[in-house]
Every structure is written in C-alpha cells, then in structure tokens.
C-alpha cells in the first residue's frame, strides 16, 4: 500500500510476468507449444491460481514472514495447497536438472526461489534483478 493508501500491484505484476516468462522457457525446453503459455492453460490458470484460493492464502502467510512448514502446520494443516505440493513433487528433480545443466538456472529464478521457500523453508526474498534475464526467445 502506498503512502496515499492506494493499493500497489507492481510486485504482483512482476511475479506474474516472470511466472509466464519461466513457463515459456520450460515449455520451449520440453518441446511444447508456446501458445499455451499465453492462453487459458498458462496465463489464464496462473491468474486464477494467484488471485485467490489456497495458493493465494498460503502466499499471504509466506509474505508475512511465516516459514512454509509453520504456515502449513499451523494454519493450513488439513488443506491441500496445490502449488506447494507441486513444488515438493518437482523440486528435487528440478534442482538435480539445474545441477546437471539440463535446466538453465538463470532462466528460472522464480521457480527456484519458490522451490527453496517450500522445500527448504527459505525466507521469501525474490531475486528481482534476476528476473527477465534468462533464455526466452
């Protein structure tokens, strides 16, 4: 919120755009159709997921500085948080693929940050300077 009480969405917009950027990278890497990134399967789903529901609720706790494991245990113990489950499911594989050079870390800083937050209880600190710098043509 700005000094004049206006709600500011610049950070959310940056995260949303970076999410699409990284999705395009991963779709290209896996031989998918980039069109899906910018239509309902990509942008549409990301918008709905990020603007409400359980993922958004977890994001609020994380944004308040509550570590993922504590937020899950204390506030959402019996709730399925799909984004977190996905990060836990793919996190180790993504980290291994980055270590093996199969995924370019510079192209997915947001994904790696989210994996770190969910899988390793890292604090929420986004690498803003690394955004929009990866290999997306």
Q: What are these regions, as identified by a protein language model?
A:
Residues 3-7, 17-24, 28-137:
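NAD(P)-dependent Rossmann-like dehydrogenase/reductase catalytic/cofactor-binding core
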Residues 11-15:
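Short, contiguous, pocket-lining structural segments
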């Amino acid at each position: 919120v700005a000094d004049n009480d206006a709600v500011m969405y610049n950070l959310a917009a940056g995260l949303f755009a970076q999410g699409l950027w990284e999705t395009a990278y991963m779709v290209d890497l896996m031989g998918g159709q980039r069109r899906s990134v910018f239509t309902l399967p990509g942008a549409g789903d990301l918008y709905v997921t990020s603007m409400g529901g359980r993922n958004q609720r977890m994001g609020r706790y994380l944004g308040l500085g509550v570590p993922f494991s504590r937020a899950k245990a204390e506030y959402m113990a019996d709730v399925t948080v799909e984004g977190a489950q996905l990060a836990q499911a793919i996190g180790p594989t993504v980290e291994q693929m980055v270590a093996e050079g199969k995924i370019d870390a510079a192209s997915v800083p947001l994904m790696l940050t989210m994996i770190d937050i969910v899988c390793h209880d890292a604090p929420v600190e986004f690498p803003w300077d690394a955004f929009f710098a990866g290999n997306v043509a």
